[in-house]
Swiss-Prot record:
Tissue specificity as recorded in UniProt: Expressed by the venom gland.
Organism: Daboia palaestinae (Palestine viper)
Cross-referenced SMART domains: PA2c (SM00085)
Main location (coarse class): secreted
Family: Belongs to the phospholipase A2 family. Group II subfamily. D49 sub-subfamily.
Signal peptide (UniProt feature, chain positions): 1-16
Name listed for the protein in its UniProt record: Acidic phospholipase A2 VpaPLA2
A biological process term (GO) from this entry: lipid catabolic process
Cysteines joined through disulfide linkages: C42-C131, C44-C60, C59-C111, C65-C138, C66-C104, C73-C97, C91-C102
Keyword Hydrolase found: yes
Cofactor: how and how many bound: Binds 1 Ca(2+) ion.
Keyword rRNA processing: no
Length: 138
């Protein structure tokens, strides 16, 4: 419980894109987005290595790969425009880099929603030391 409190305090200062991504996750899963996924499995959160532990963790792996294709802005810091229309996330930026970041986040949020049945609390706050298998390629 103490660790979750620390994570919550750290996230209170998060601005811009990460709060946008959390909002997308919340809309698609009904969960408190960032807290539910920030340190889940081997790929959700900062960095990532090893083998994705389940379909939820694979959503994060694919999200990391997507960020790796973004050029011209920092995916973790860029603020983009988006809206929710009839339950769908719609990215609305004219800037190609910001639109790409939004699309990465949109696809990941949808993936989390589609794979909620694989979410397993044993992978919350998962140890980095359990992610030592060879990493897959994007």
């Amino acid at each position: 419980m103490r660790t979750l409190w620390i994570v919550a305090v750290c996230l209170m200062g998060v601005e811009g894109h990460l709060t946008q991504f959390g909002d997308m996750i919340n809309k698609k899963t009904g969960t408190f987005g960032l807290l539910s996924y920030v340190y889940y499995g081997c790929y959700c959160g900062l960095g990532g290595k090893g083998k994705p532990q389940d379909a939820t963790d694979r959503c994060c792996f694919v999200h990391d790969c997507c960020y790796g294709t973004v050029n011209g802005c920092d995916p973790k810091l860029s603020t983009y425009s988006y809206s929710f229309q009839n339950g769908d996330i719609v990215c609305g930026d004219d800037d190609p880099c910001l639109r790409a970041v939004c699309e990465c986040d949109r696809v990941a949020a949808i993936c989390f929603g589609e794979n909620m049945n694989t979410y397993d609390k044993k992978y919350m706050l998962y140890s980095f030391f359990d992610c030592m298998e060879e990493s897959e390629k994007c």
